[in-house]
């Protein structure tokens, strides 16, 4: 039997925290959104499928969660200008961003490298890497307002 990890969140730890979740329309992104909503987070949900976002928004509101902001956003088709427009909207509507959960991604093509085209590789890199880079980079001023750094001295050599 496959082990399924569980997530334990202390009561009120996400209450009124602003959390942006990509890939929120289905799968892991949707599950993370529902858990965060049950814990009263203020959600910004991104997906390329607006119908799935509307459905999730209804579920969250019906279950007593805060009404999430939903944004149709296709990481495969988005340009830098689209990312900038999204970031500008975040700056206009939020004082800070407490969390950024990158879930949107594509598996890619399961074939030997000899059978993989450059365009197939570019698709995977654009959705799985470039989108995370651009969204994080443009959101950093909002995220830095909520960062906490903890370090523990460690020894590099025994």
Give the role of each language-model region.
Residues 86, 111-113, 117-125:
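Substrate-binding pocket helix/loop in short-chain dehydrogenase/reductase
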Residues 136-137:
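A short, exposed helix-loop element centered on a Lys and neighboring polar residues
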Residues 63-79:
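Rossmann-fold cofactor-recognition segment
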Residues 25-27:
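Conserved glycine-rich cofactor-binding loop
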Residues 41-55:
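Conserved glycine-rich Rossmann-like NAD(P)H-binding loop of the short-chain dehydrogenase/reductase
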Residues 104-109:
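Conserved NAD(P)H cofactor-binding loop of Rossmann-fold oxidoreductase domains
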